[in-house]
Amino acid sequence: MIPLKKANKPNFENQNHGAGGGIPILKTMWEKFGFSFLFSSIDKHSGLSAWKLVFAYVSGLVSNSRSVNKIAEHCSKSPIIREILGGTTISQSALSRFFSKDFDWLQSSLMRVKSFCSSSPETAICDGDVVALDDTKIEHPYGKKMPFLCWLFDNSEKKHLWCMNLVSTLLVRGNGLVTPLSWRIWVQDKENKSKSKRTKLDLAKEMLLSLRKVSSAKLWVSMDRWFLCKDFFQWLNSNDYDWVTKCKRNTALYQLRGSDWNGKSRYSPVNPGKLLAIVYNKLIETGKAGQIASVSIPDIYIKLPEMEPNKKGKLVKKQVYTPVAAVATIRLPEDMDNQRVAIDIADPDEKAAHFKGAYLLISNRVDAPEQAVIAYAKRWKIEVFYRNSKQELGLTACHSQTKMAHEAHIEMIFIAETLLNYINWEVNKDGAITLTHGEMIREIINASHRVSYRNTLHLYFDTSCIKFARFIKRFWPKYYDLGLGRMPYHLLDATA
């Protein structure tokens, strides 16, 4: 006997329609960059290969599923994902147990960058590309006793909160392709809050050194003013990185004032805000409305530490006047964003030097101030990356009590963003179609679809065929089964 209440409910056990119609395109990119091989060394879990579990998790993140239970439900309801996974239904417990296992996700992150950046010339790292360095706070209000959480001040929320402090790097290429690189979790010493086991500068050095295992190209490091540290600048110079950052209002700068009667150069302290006031009228006359304008200020120096021998021949650290490129800028992308907070309320000294909307950039490239401005403007891409990850991929949605699960969740988001950014770049690079990150996910990847089984498997999109036909035909996979290689199974007709 079937209860009347249950009989009145529709039965969708074998439904042939659902969301995620563009997941096969995500699978094409996954196979193009060989991401399955990154997890080939992991043993099967619950009868499933590790790369299938990872792909299922990434597909769930793209569908904006905010929990492991929702991800498992999405994978079981989407007919095309079931076909890609070989008809296997993934349970919530299988995902939870797999991503709570001990695994070196930091090494996996490095292998992801190597695999992606070595696959084709368009994804390669070249001279002049920009590495954006920044951190963000991932709030966890109910996890005060978790050892990897910190009690920090959030400028956007204007309050202190318990959070996980994520430090990461992002690559912005000259062709416009954006790729998330490495990440680290900064841990604060809760007994002595003024100290930590490792500083964020140490984590930044570690990530930039790992990037040297992938490429030896001459790169820019574009960073927020929080990373303004003289020792860090010297470290970047010694590791063949160019750098650019915003100047703080209390940064000690010096201007060359000629030389004395012995021919020795004379320097006088100069306030960054006063430098901006001097060139402000010239600055607002340059450039066009809504575009970045800049004016280079010559003969600006900063004291950087260097090891030099003293009279006894012993190496000691001395502060040496070093020329820097000082550029007054206005209308930077980050300054034109209304959601951005202009002042650090927790530490007023961290406020950027400014004058009527103009800011001062400093860089080691004295010979190329224009390139320094372009490199710093690209730093805004990492802010957009954080925003997209939180709003569309659920960066703040992991509530596990183990650090391993959080590390796995972060790496899954970085994998998803690597693939999504490449797809978005392919869609927009010709200029015929202009889609934002969210529009691309909604109109292509998460488009509604219906599967029809005949001699071959047909898939019908609920999206604009004419707009995306060429793109879908180009990147539609030949085979639906996800494996280490291309498996000769049923064909997917690219008839959109």
Model-predicted segments: where are they?
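Short, solvent-exposed helix-loop connector elements
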Residues: L38-H45, P369-Y376, N388-A408, V427-D430
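Basic, amphipathic alpha-helical segments enriched in Lys/Arg and hydrophobic/aromatic residues
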Residues: A397-S452
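Active-site-proximal, Lys/Arg-enriched surface segment
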Residues: S96-L177
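Short, conserved catalytic/metal-binding motifs centered on acidic residues
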Residues: A56-Y57, I71, S91, L95, ...
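An anionic, glycine-rich sequence signature occurring as long contiguous blocks
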Residues: V178, K193-K197, D242, K248-K381, ...
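Basic, short loop/linker segments at the boundary and entry of helix-turn-helix/winged-helix-like folds
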Residues: E13-A56, S194-R198
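Domain-level cores of phosphate- or acyl-group-handling catalytic modules
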Residues: E191-K264
